[in-house]
Amino acid sequence: MTEPNRQSGEKEERIIEIEIERLRPFKEHPFQVKDDKEMFLLQESIEKYGILNPLIVRPVPDGYYEIISGHRRKHAAEKLGYRKVPVIIRVLSEDDSILSMVDSNLHRERISYSEKAFAYKLKNDVLKRKSGRKKSQVDHKTLRKRSIDIISEDCGDSPKQVQRYISLTKLIPEMLQKLDDEIISFCPAVEIAALKENEQRELLKAMDYAQAIPSLSQAQRIKQLSLSLIHISEPT
């Protein structure tokens, strides 16, 4: 018989096994599941020791379960031919599910810029929604502090850095991929994110044509030029 897993401050939770086919990925999951070296090592570990940490899931209609934490473990187990995986079932609201999903993934050893950017944005959106609710519906921490400050405390980045990451979600996919591939550096990418979509696409064409990447100072000048053009076009 499986021993219950006790979470601090929570009631006892049982670990049960559920068929993989009944598990669905979290619909707003910003973290990529790749067949890379880390996945290979995870498969080796599961093959040798089994799944040591159960997946966290929540029930959804039609007898299925949405994965909150454990997308990579589920993928590795599936590749190894597992039919069932150990899970802990939690009944969570949509917003609490997002917070739990983001927090459980942000502490991974390797996270891409885009994953972190969209994770921070998801968490920021939820915390801002919670701050607009009645006091009885949210904890005191959410009421006292800005959402950016809460993310900063939880994740270790400064509030300014959290804002920079969130701004990256405004990059077009092709530019964001160049950032993840470390073709563009972080700080220039933050400046480029302030450009309109059509401006980013024109810049991308220029980069490809010249086979060159803008430096921070160049990206800042491009951003300032964009802002000045906006002011010129505004009616007086």
Functional labels for PLM-detected ranges:
Residues 1-90, 96-110:
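Short, charged/polar connector segments at secondary-structure boundaries
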Residues 31-32, 39-40, 75-170, 180, ...:
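Amphipathic, charge-rich alpha-helical segments that serve as recognition/docking helices
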Residues 32, 51-53, 137, 200, ...:
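Glutamine-centric residue-chemistry signal
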Residues 40-43, 121, 201, 205:
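Amphipathic, non-transmembrane alpha-helical secondary structure
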Residues 66, 115, 234:
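Acidic-residue sensor for enzyme active/binding pockets
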Residues 167-173, 183-229:
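EF-Ts-like protein-protein interaction surfaces
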Residues 228-236:
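Residue-level detector of conserved catalytic or cofactor/ligand-binding positions
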